[in-house]
């Protein structure tokens, strides 16, 4: 063998060999907790293999990569939440909020019918930008920009601008506060929906960019652009697991035992703010208040 993950060709261990052994020992410490609990998510984000293919076959945005955009601009916004990443054939039962950004093909694998029924039953579908704009064969629709989304969202798409700039901003409709928007821009006319946010400036100034439409017991929130992380989080309708710096990923587990797992992922120090006293299972320490987290450190926290 020219390469081995744990031992070199002379049979000598690498540094990573010790790290793997340490990780195995730490998993053993947490065995009962991990086997007796699970991650329960009320939020899901769509990631579509068809959208990957569409972005390659028929690219619509300059310097756009579907995977990195979802990871860095959408999923990263929910580092402090329990969130599932699902394909379009995945069941929607059990979720309260579904994000479908850049989901170029929605009408596949029965998703169109299932998501409509899920919304009618009380779900919140945060869809867009640039969702429902292509068939599964990477072709555009000819009767409208979307296959069905205009009707479901209660809008008419007046303008589309798939060219990013750093000048456009949006403001909340009927309230104060502006926020950054990016990547692409659609402007809508309302056909039953209400405007949540409008363009603050530019040629679309005053036109709706984010809308909301009640459908049955649920609602469809249509994004005509990609807003900043705080705005995305506001549509989840829930609070983070705990306050923490952006380089920490938090996961809450529940079952016969409850725990919060914090992982530093960027090789720099972070801060986690605890809402009480917690036992850290790997080190045996009791932690409370503002806790410093070392680069690549893992904390397994059980509330005392």
Language-model features and meaning:
Residues 1-304:
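Carbohydrate-binding surfaces of carbohydrate-active enzymes
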């Amino acid at each position: 063998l020219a390469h081995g993950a744990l031992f070199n060709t002379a049979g000598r261990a690498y540094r990573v060999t010790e790290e793997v052994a340490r990780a195995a020992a730490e998993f053993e410490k947490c065995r009962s907790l991990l086997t007796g609990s699970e991650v329960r998510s009320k939020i899901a984000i769509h990631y579509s293999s068809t959208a990957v293919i569409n972005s390659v076959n028929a690219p619509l945005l300059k310097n756009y990569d579907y995977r990195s955009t979802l990871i860095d601009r959408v999923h990263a916004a929910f580092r402090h939440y329990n969130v599932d990443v699902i394909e379009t054939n995945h069941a929607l039962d059990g979720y309260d909020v579904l994000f479908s950004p850049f989901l170029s093909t929605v009408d596949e694998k029965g998703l169109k019918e299932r998501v409509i029924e899920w919304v009618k039953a009380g779900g919140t579908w945060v869809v867009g930008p640039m969702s429902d704009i292509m068939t599964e064969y990477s072709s555009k629709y000819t009767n409208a920009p979307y296959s069905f989304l205009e009707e479901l969202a209660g809008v008419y798409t007046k303008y589309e601008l798939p060219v990013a700039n750093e000048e456009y901003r949006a403001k909340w409709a009927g309230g104060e506060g502006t926020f950054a928007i990016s990547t692409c821009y659609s402007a809508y006319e309302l056909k039953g929906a209400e405007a949540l946010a409008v363009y603050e400036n530019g040629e679309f100034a005053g036109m709706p960019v984010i809308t909301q439409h009640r459908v049955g017991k649920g609602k469809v929130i249509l994004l005509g652009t990609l807003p900043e992380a705080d705005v995305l989080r506001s549509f989840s309708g829930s609070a983070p697991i705990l306050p923490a710096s952006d380089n920490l990923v938090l996961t809450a587990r529940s079952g016969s035992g409850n725990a919060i797992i914090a992982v530093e992922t960027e090789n720099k120090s972070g801060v986690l703010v605890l809402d009480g006293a917690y036992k850290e299972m790997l080190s045996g320490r009791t932690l409370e208040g503002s806790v410093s987290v070392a680069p690549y450190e893992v904390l397994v926290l059980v509330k005392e």
